[in-house]
Amino acid sequence: MASKLSVEVAPLGHARVFRGRSLITDDARVFEDGPRRAREFGGVRNDVAEREMPLVSAVAACEPSEDGRYRYFMGDEVRESAAGKPQEGFEDLVLPAGTIVAVVHVPFRLQASAALHAAQARRSFYEDWLPASGYESAADEVGFSDVELYHYRRRRFRRARKMVLDLLFVIRRA
């Protein structure tokens, strides 16, 4: 079956640095912990120094440990120069320059259905696109398999803004 995904593969020209907060959770508690962390981060996100504009927010779930627990990260993109300057109360998630990423744009109409469409895109990426691509996941190199990127764009000829969701998959040649 041919994949219907639109996938762009390219090495990162510069490091992408995301500063935020994370928590350790497991599959049983992620639906309680995730929204709580989002509310908490929403209250302190304006304190993040050197945020990149336009604003890009990231969500990443790191690879699980042997006991099934994993780190769930939420943060905003900051300037590359901020990577070497830790900020108290926050941690950084860094995608180094040269990292090969596959970018999948996730189309959706209603914001409430974004998570469902992201899950479908992930499944299609791993089951259809990746095996036939000549690439493999590089999650072991960076500690997470993908990053959800949320940003907004203006609609043409309107003042309204639309949320855009992209998935970044960290890959390498097989």
Predicted regions and their residues:
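A solvent-exposed interaction/effector surface
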Residues: 1-174
